[in-house]
A protein has these predicted regions:
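Hydrophobic, well-ordered beta-alpha structural blocks that scaffold small-molecule cofactor pockets
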Residues: 1-117
Length: 117
């Protein structure tokens, strides 16, 4: 139970850091578990510019509760930082969308590994 509040705190610190630097932050992958996390953290369209997604069934819609627009993943090059939302495929999404561009990111997976140290 304590761990989820630490994860929330780390996500909010990440967002605050990049917002204070006037950087644009996106979420990656409009998965249900990621949306649940965003709502738990109180993150909304004022915090994340959009959610990057590949599924045509989700693009041009909004996340429930947080009203963040869901856009085509090809738009990733326009952003400064990212939160990878589905923690079970963090490595795959990092390699696919962020690694070559060296965009800073966080994810539940990354935070949990950091907390274990």
């Amino acid at each position: 139970e304590k761990k989820i509040f630490l994860i929330k705190s780390e996500i909010l610190k990440f967002i605050k850091k990049y917002k204070n630097e006037k950087k644009t932050i996106v979420g990656i992958a409009a998965a249900t578990k990621g949306n649940t996390l965003l709502n738990f953290c109180g993150v909304n369209y004022k915090d994340l510019k959009c959610i990057i997604e590949s599924s045509p069934y989700k693009i041009h819609k909004f996340t429930p509760g947080s009203a963040i627009p869901i856009v085509n993943e090809k738009n990733i090059k326009k952003y400064d930082a990212a939160i990878i939302l589905p923690w079970n495929i963090t490595k795959h999404l990092y390699r696919k969308l962020l690694q070559k561009r060296k965009i800073p990111y966080t994810s539940v997976d990354k935070i949990v590994r950091k907390l274990k140290k």
